[in-house]
Amino acid sequence: MAQLICEHLSLGYEGSEILHDLNFSVDAGDYLCIVGENGSGKSTLMKAILGLLPPLAGKVRTGDGLKRNEIGYLPQQTIVQRDFPASVREIVLSGCQGRCGLRPFYNRAEKALADRNIERMGLSDLQKRCYRDLSGGQQQRVLLARALCATQKLLLLDEPVSGLDPVVTAEMYRLIESLNREGTTIVMISHDIDAAVRYASHVLHIGKTVFFGTKAAYRQSAPYRRFFEGGDAA
């Protein structure tokens, strides 16, 4: 059953349309990779899914019992984020804020959840370290642990391996794949077409031609062929 549905979705800014009449759905347990040309609207779509940008037309809705506050988000890293002066545990625990309601403090269950996700991401030895002193790959694992404190159901990942070296990139992809195998639905923006067809179950290609379907069907599609013939820059 679909957890996320986009119906006849058109997006843009100040009346200027970037995406037109987009239709796709994400079922529980899917691993959807969103690829496309630079400026094609991938990050704009992510904003709409998060409810940060109202559609020009159409709608984004959730299903299968998924609530809006059960969508975890790993944004692209910025310089300000990389230099954030807080401990690893403090940052991971902040992912539980949506669970607190009006309470000013985290309860025992929320602290235990943060500790489990710290261990899950292999960060137990780093939890007292300052976030800004970590490597790029370690920082991404911290932010992923934080997102998992918000939800175990659906994660939105915006370029999660951007700026990472090849070894750490491969490690990050394996980690995301492991989360998906354990039941977390993944929606990931990526410039890496190879990773999309290696790890994802489904691909959404946004550009002059829009494709949505399984990765097997994507390998036979015109957008995929154009990319490898050098026609598109994803």
Model-identified regions with their sequence ranges:
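Conserved ABC ATPase "signature" region
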Residues: 108-126
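Conserved ABC ATPase signature
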Residues: 130-134, 138
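Catalytic Walker B motif of ABC-type/P-loop ATPase nucleotide-binding domains
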Residues: 155-158
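H-loop/switch region of ABC-family ATPase nucleotide-binding domains
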Residues: 190-191
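Conserved ABC transporter NBD signature motif
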Residues: 58-69
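H-loop (His-switch) and adjacent beta-strand-loop-beta switch element
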Residues: 203-216
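Helix N-cap at the start of a conserved alpha-helix in ABC-type nucleotide-binding domains
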Residues: 166-168
